[in-house]
């Protein structure tokens, strides 16, 4: 007698029950409404009033609506029950929209419990889409994509929209479609706009020219002195805002030694000649030329020497080869460098503040509208929107037009050819310009470090430690210590988040195929195009009212640091993933390892140098940023650059320069330590390969 054994699959408990339960636990244990003074500084009565269950209000409905999803079988539904899964995803999205809309109408901010509830609803959407087998039914991929879209929408798209809202409202808060014309019709504002555009174009031309000079020297002329290029690629990154402008002031300001020399030897009468267009242009060219240099340096290295060799073979002279072959191949890089510098010049806030004089630009004008004696959101929004639109136009030209053109010179042919000599006149001109550039920068940074040790620049050059004593000799709770420690803390939190978030976006963009992939990449890269001043104002407008109150908190400072630098993590991740064959991922997945395990065990070890580079760059940029967070900091959330700004506004240039010098030394030390660690890891891997 035989028996047939039927194997029935074990039915799993539906995880949606657990996520709904998590939402109710958050409702019971955490405040559903925001607290004006935070969880640690609020009174017991304020905390109790923030709990949703403390009184009957709309927040009860926030948790009751998701509970309707519990009207279902206890066990997990199958793939065939597609209607059920679409209902789960749609209902979760509806609950999110209802929470945001009702909190906005109530005029109250969302609390910690609602953050947990949003996570639970997002998880329910992820489960539903996974069961529908979207993107292959990979839960991690769908969850990552959901989180990316949500964060981009909240912290990039919404602030970019929020900055336009005050443009169309009057003083009474009523809709006024032409309110912004009252600002743009002012003669002073028109002049400010023209000043900004004229300055940015002039700076773009200057930086592109000097960047090309530096790039030609390091790639085609220098042999052992190519380290100069590396020095100039690091210095502007670690130089805090205001420091370059202050250094130029020490050299050529009213009491600068170059100005005094010109007065004594050439009879100069106008000692204020630096302040205005000339001073801003000079400081920005010094600050942004290394950015153009890095772009052009990489472009020149990719030019195939065989093309120039072919030109010489056809009896072309050195100048004909340079003008007919070399320069045309650099056109996309030249345009790219020019456009990026134009955007950086428009966004620059620190140098015009120090050297502007009566020459007003958009970035400083927006700052004064927000922090001046008379708050004017309409004017700040109008100028910010104009600056944003102009920067986006430049960015779109760079991204869509230049990015689509082909200037390929590296083919599959094995013969590469030899680099041909440049015209002798060009070589000597480049060397002469480079000598002037090096001498000027040596004087600049020498003045910065020497000026931090003087009593009063231009009056008393006696060496002293008074500036450093005022900064760091008054105890840990006074002077510069609080701002320095807070800055290191915020940057230390923001840097790993930036690197991880950027790598996650890069992995989704490079390794996954779905509709809207280009939109996600383009939207995240907009962070580079949005000027820092505009980003700061937009965050104030977006997160200073219901349903999300973040202004005045450390969270908004950290979020700003992350979102401003996340494109760096994305680009580092895309570059790193481009060097890793996709077959490694496929082999891992074929062995039933999930996407998360593949990332942690396969990709992350291989991407370690790229991650460390993104980490250190994000850390340094977070420390030196000013234009975005200057609007977001408070006395309780102090940062180093805001402290330097306050010293500049108070005329304490010596203290500001001393603080900047300390930051330069600290960040250079951090960069070289990380560079040494990356180099050690590469060396150890190379030794392991050789031994194998």
Predicted regions and their residues:
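Transmembrane alpha-helical segments of polytopic membrane transport and secretion proteins
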Residues: 1-22, 68-94, 118-147, 224-226, ...
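Membrane-water interface segments at the C-terminal ends of transmembrane alpha-helices
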Residues: 14-40, 57-63, 88-115, 142-171, ...
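Hydrophobic alpha-helical segments
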Residues: 67-78, 340-392
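A short glycine-centered flexible hinge/capping loop motif at secondary-structure junctions
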Residues: 207, 314-316, 591-593
């Amino acid at each position: 007698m035989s028996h047939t054994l039927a194997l029935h699959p074990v039915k799993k408990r539906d995880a949606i029950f657990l996520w709904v339960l998590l939402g109710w636990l958050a409702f019971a244990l955490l405040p559903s409404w925001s607290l004006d003074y935070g969880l640690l500084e609020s009174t017991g009565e304020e905390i109790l009033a923030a709990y949703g269950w403390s009184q009957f209000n709309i927040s009860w409905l926030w948790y009751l609506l998701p509970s309707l999803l519990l009207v279902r079988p206890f066990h997990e539904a199958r793939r065939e029950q597609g209607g059920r899964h679409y209902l789960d995803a749609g209902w979760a999205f509806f609950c999110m929209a209802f929470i945001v809309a009702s909190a906005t109408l109530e005029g109250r901010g969302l609390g910690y419990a609602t953050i947990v509830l949003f996570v639970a609803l997002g998880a329910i959407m992820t489960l539903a889409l996974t069961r529908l087998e979207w993107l292959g039914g990979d839960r991690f991929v769908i969850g990552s994509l959901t989180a990316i879209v949500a964060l981009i929408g909240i912290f990039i798209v919404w602030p970019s929209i929020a900055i336009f809202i005050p443009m169309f409202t009057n003083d009474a808060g009523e809709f006024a479609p032409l309110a912004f014309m009252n600002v743009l019709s002012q003669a002073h504002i028109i002049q400010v706009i023209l000043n900004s555009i004229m300055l940015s174009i002039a700076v773009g031309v200057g930086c592109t020219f000097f960047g090309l000079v530096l790039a030609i020297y390091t790639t085609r002329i220098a042999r052992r002195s190519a380290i100069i290029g590396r020095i100039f690629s690091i210095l502007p990154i670690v130089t805090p805002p205001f420091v370059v402008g202050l250094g130029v002031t020490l050299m050529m300001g009213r009491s600068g030694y170059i100005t005094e020399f010109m007065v004594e030897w050439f009879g100069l009468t106008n000692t204020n000649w630096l302040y205005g267009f000339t001073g801003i242009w000079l400081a920005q060219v010094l600050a942004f030329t290394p950015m153009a240099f890095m772009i052009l340096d990489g472009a020149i290295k990719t030019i195939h020497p065989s093309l120039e060799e072919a030109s010489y073979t056809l009896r072309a002279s050195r100048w004909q080869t340079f003008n007919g072959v070399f320069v045309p191949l650099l056109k996309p890089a030249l345009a790219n460098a020019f456009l990026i510098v134009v955007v950086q010049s428009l966004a620059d806030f620190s140098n015009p503040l120090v050297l502007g004089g009566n020459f007003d630009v958009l970035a400083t004008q927006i700052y004064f509208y927000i922090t001046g004696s008379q708050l004017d959101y309409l004017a700040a929004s109008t100028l910010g929107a104009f600056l944003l639109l102009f920067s986006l136009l430049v960015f779109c030209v760079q991204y869509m037009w230049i990015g689509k053109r082909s200037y390929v010179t590296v083919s599959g042919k094995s013969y590469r050819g030899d680099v041909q000599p440049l015209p002798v006149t060009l070589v000597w001109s480049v060397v002469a310009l480079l000598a002037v550039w090096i001498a000027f920068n040596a004087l600049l940074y020498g003045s910065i470090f020497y000026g931090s040790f003087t009593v009063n620049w231009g009056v008393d050059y006696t060496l002293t430690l008074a500036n450093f004593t005022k900064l760091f000799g008054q105890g840990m709770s006074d002077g510069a210590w609080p701002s320095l420690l807070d800055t290191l803390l915020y940057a230390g939190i923001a840097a790993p988040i930036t690197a991880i978030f950027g790598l996650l976006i890069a992995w989704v963009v490079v390794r996954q195929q779905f509709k809207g992939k280009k939109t996600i990449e383009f939207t995240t890269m907009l962070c580079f195009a949005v000027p820092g001043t505009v980003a700061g104002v937009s965050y104030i407008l977006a997160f200073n009212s219901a349903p999300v109150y973040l202004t005045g908190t450390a969270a908004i400072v950290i979020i700003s640091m992350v979102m401003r630098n996340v494109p760096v993590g994305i680009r580092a991740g895309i570059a790193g993933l481009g060097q890793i064959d996709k077959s490694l991922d496929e082999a891992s997945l074929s062995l039933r390892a999930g996407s998360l395990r593949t990332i942690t065990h396969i990709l992350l070890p291989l991407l370690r140098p790229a991650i460390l580079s993104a980490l250190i760059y994000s850390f340094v940029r977070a420390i030196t940023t000013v234009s975005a967070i200057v609007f977001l900091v408070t006395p309780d959330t102090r940062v180093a650059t805001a402290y330097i700004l306050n010293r500049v506004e108070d005329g304490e240039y010596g203290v500001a320069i001393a603080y900047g010098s300390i930051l330069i030394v600290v960040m250079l030390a951090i960069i070289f330590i990380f560079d040494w660690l990356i180099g050690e890891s590469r060396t150890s891997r190379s030794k392991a390969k050789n031994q194998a």
